[in-house]
């Protein structure tokens, strides 16, 4: 029979059985806060990619902004916009190491498991917030050919075809492909109102399962996806309050110079992201008499290009073109006890190696050379000239463009050993105790080669000395800047887990857990653009000192060098200190319960948590605006609660609701600045401020009403589905001066089913709610991406 779109309370883990190498029981029987979504759940909630999971899962927030490169996942007060993720992702038991690969098409996905809270003992690094496990359909349990076609407003189209074939009792396979086109939602006023975010994507997947014997299974997967999209539709919001305050502290005043562009997207260059993503893997499972052995091998190749108009304006200032080429190979060997034993245990070894090659040149255009290099230098000279007895200096830069280049190789090696044991029915019936420990080793290194175009500049120096004056100048001096070197560091982590659980009835339990989480450190390669600017300044000063007509002038050279050393001292550059960010750690405490009530017609999942995080990683733009960096923010504290309810009210009507509350604040985050006398001055105190990008509340309320039609009707069933998704308040900055208030979007779907076919009419953001999906600040200016507007669509599914 055709699978019905129904949200009645059925045990998804029994209907969609997934072989997992590590867990011994169903997720609702374990001491963990988890949400399981079937393919029917995903259709009802219009989940087409990982970014559509926001709100459906309590305390999960994944802002939909930028491009496929930017998959920022926040759970329970922690998350990441760039570099290492705080939430892990596994697809068919194979880890996706790089978050640049997290956003992919869900055309063939059968089930998604979302585990909240640290999963470090069994899954290791970068799962301190939780874990998302994605499972594709098994051709052994599902046969036939699925065809899906869809169209929607804003010129959106998609089509997919997948064939599932069971050749014999020993071999089955599935193969298929998809294509999707997005016409774009947002317009660029600087480029004749062209759509900023239009995109095309396509790909294919193959999965083959071979059973050589009754106790041996070999599961092979290969998939490839290519996408080419416009992106980064950021509206200008004006001069920031923080920028005004900082200028005021320095006795300066900044005023709005782009008032006509507030509320508009206005880039002169088209920003885009292009990605090719190949994944393959082999799962081997051997069932012995007393244990199950699994060996999982994975390989991923990612090749992408991001082009970003990084001044985010209609002016021709500067842009960045970042290219990544990553190859990752992973291997995991797991031994676990067979289900039903009093002693349930899991022992494993895991390792991966990633080769990552990145190029990220920043190109200053003619206006950028003028405003950000020449004018900045002359502004500093004017400030010096305002002091009594100071010289007058001026600079002219001749470069029509200036490239601040960078080539980086950042390989990562990781290995781990782990064990977890659960003792069931300990002392009394239903009481279980779990203890586990993981030893995790990681080595990261960076080989960098950052070369900048030499600055071609003229310099004038004038100083009045009584009746005499010094007038010196030189033309076409050259100032290069380069960084070439290698850094490496390694970490050893112990990730323990303790849990106690009491089960008094099947799928009725309470539990308490204590776990330690860990997120990897790394290197900020985009920081080299900032360092290069500093090095260019030092290099220009050196060129002036070495000039035969200025610094080497026979009469005044020594005096000028001494004066310049006092007025424009060289800045020391420590590459390691400037580019390295430390690992993030957390201790996580949780109590919860899984309840099955009302004769199985009501499910309730409850949890409360407390997280103590140290060296929390935060993403922000560098002060120059030339790139994003990760910094460590001291300590933070997060606590909250979650509740999920599902009820089958009648045979026709089912309801569901989920709510999450998170209170995440900094407890030790103070920024100081060294003074000339050796003392430190507090420049920012964020203690007590809310952690950015973490909604205080998430809410999802949904329902379904299924009508079984009479035999004389055209349709067999009509299914009405609706859900309301909400989140907020969300603070966007550490200062907590910009935020998005609590907001919600209403979505609905109507399915008309006849035999093995179904046509669906749907709407997203039906009330056309206007809200900010993302906000950031750079160079004292604010930018925002709006949430997508109201959209209507129709889908056709057919199986034969």
Region locations from a protein language model:
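Short acidic/polar hinge/loop motifs at secondary-structure boundaries
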Residues: 92-116
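Outer-membrane beta-barrel translocator/receptor signature
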Residues: 71, 85, 98, 107-110, ...
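Periplasmic-side early beta-strands and strand-to-turn transitions of outer-membrane beta-barrels
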Residues: 141-142, 150, 166-261, 265-267, ...
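Extracytoplasmic beta-strand/coil segments of soluble accessory domains associated
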Residues: 34, 51-94, 110
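C-terminal beta-signal and adjacent terminal beta-strands/loops
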Residues: 518, 655, 724-733, 748-800
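Gram-negative outer-membrane beta-barrel transporters
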Residues: 336, 344-346, 350-352, 427, ...
């Amino acid at each position: 029979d055709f699978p019905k779109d129904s949200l009645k309370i059925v045990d998804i883990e029994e209907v969609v059985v997934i072989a997992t190498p590590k867990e011994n029981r169903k997720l609702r029987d374990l001491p963990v806060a988890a949400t399981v979504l079937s393919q029917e759940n995903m259709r009802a909630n219009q989940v087409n990619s990982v970014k559509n999971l926001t709100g459906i899962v309590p305390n999960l927030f994944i802002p939909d902004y930028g491009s496929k490169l930017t998959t920022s996942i926040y759970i329970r007060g922690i998350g990441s916009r760039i570099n290492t993720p705080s939430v892990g992702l596994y697809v068919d038991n194979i880890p996706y190491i790089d978050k640049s690969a997290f956003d992919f098409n869900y055309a063939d996905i059968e089930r998604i498991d979302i585990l909240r809270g640290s999963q470090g003992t069994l899954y290791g690094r970068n799962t301190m917030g939780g874990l998302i496990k994605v499972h594709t359909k098994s051709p052994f349990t599902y046969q036939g050919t699925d065809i899906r076609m869809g169209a929607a407003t804003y010129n959106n189209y998609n089509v997919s075809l997948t064939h599932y074939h069971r050749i014999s009792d020993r071999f089955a396979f599935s193969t298929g492909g998809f294509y999707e086109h997005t016409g774009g939602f947002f317009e660029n006023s600087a480029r004749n109102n062209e759509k900023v975010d239009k995109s095309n994507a396509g790909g294919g997947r193959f999965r083959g399962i071979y059973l050589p014997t009754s106790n041996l299974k070999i599961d092979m997967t290969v998939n490839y996806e290519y996408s080419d999209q416009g992106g980064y539709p950021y509206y200008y919001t004006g001069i920031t309050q923080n920028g005004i305050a900082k200028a005021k502290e320095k006795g300066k005043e900044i005023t709005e110079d782009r008032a006509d562009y507030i509320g508009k997207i206005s880039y002169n260059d088209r920003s885009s992201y292009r990605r090719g993503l190949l994944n393959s893997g082999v799962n081997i499972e051997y069932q012995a008499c007393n244990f199950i052995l699994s060996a999982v091998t994975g390989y991923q190749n990612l090749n992408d290009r991001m082009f970003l108009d990084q001044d985010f304006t209609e002016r021709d200032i500067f842009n960045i073109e970042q290219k990544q080429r990553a190859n990752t190979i992973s291997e995991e060997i797991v031994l676990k006890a067979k289900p039903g034993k009093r002693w349930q245990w899991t022992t494993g070894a895991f390792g991966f190696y990633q080769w990552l090659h990145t190029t990220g040149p920043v190109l200053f255009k003619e206006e950028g050379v003028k405003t950000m290099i020449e004018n900045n230098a002359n502004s500093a000279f004017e400030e010096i000239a305002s002091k009594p007895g100071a010289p007058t200096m001026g600079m002219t830069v001749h470069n029509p463009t200036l490239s601040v280049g960078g080539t980086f190789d950042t390989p990562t090696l990781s290995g781990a050993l782990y064990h977890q044991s659960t003792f069931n029915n300990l002392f009394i019936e239903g009481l279980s105790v779990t203890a586990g420990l993981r030893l995790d080793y990681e080595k990261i290194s960076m080989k960098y080669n950052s070369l900048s175009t030499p600055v071609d500049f003229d310099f004038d120096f004038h100083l009045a000395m009584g009746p005499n004056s010094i007038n010196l100048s030189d033309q076409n001096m050259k100032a290069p800047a380069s960084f070439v070197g290698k850094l490496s560091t390694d970490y050893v982590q112990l990730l323990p887990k303790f849990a106690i659980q009491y089960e008094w009835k099947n799928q009725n339990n309470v539990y308490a857990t204590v776990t330690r989480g860990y997120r990897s450190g790394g290197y900020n390669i985009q920081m080299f653009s900032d360092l290069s600017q500093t090095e260019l300044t030092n290099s220009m000063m050196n060129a002036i000192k070495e000039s035969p007509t200025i610094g080497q002038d026979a009469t005044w050279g020594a005096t000028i060098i001494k004066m310049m050393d006092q007025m424009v001292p060289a800045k020391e550059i420590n590459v390691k200190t400037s580019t390295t960010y430390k690992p993030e750690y957390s201790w996580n405490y949780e109590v919860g319960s899984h309840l099955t009530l009302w004769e199985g017609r009501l499910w309730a999942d409850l949890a409360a948590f407390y997280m103590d995080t140290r060296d929390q990683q935060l993403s922000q733009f560098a002060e120059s605006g030339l790139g994003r960096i990760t910094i460590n923010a001291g300590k933070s504290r997060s606590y909250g609660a979650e509740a999920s309810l599902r009820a089958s009210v009648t045979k026709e009507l089912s309801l569901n609701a989920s709510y999450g509350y998170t209170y995440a604040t900094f407890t030790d985050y103070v920024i100081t600045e060294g003074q000339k006398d050796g003392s430190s001055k507090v420049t920012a105190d964020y203690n007590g401020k809310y952690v950015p990008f973490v909604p205080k509340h998430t809410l999802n309320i949904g329902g379904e009403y299924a009508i079984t039609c009479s035999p004389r009707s055209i349709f067999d069933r009509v299914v009405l589905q609706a859900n309301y998704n909400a989140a907020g308040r969300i603070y966007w900055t550490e200062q907590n001066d910009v935020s998005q208030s609590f907001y919600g979007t209403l979505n609905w779907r109507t399915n008309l089913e006849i035999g093995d076919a179904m046509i669906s009419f749907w709407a997203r953001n039906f009330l056309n709610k206007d809200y900010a999906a993302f906000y950031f600040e750079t160079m004292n200016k604010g930018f925002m991406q709006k949430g997508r507007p109201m959209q209507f669509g129709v889908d056709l599914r057919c199986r034969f």
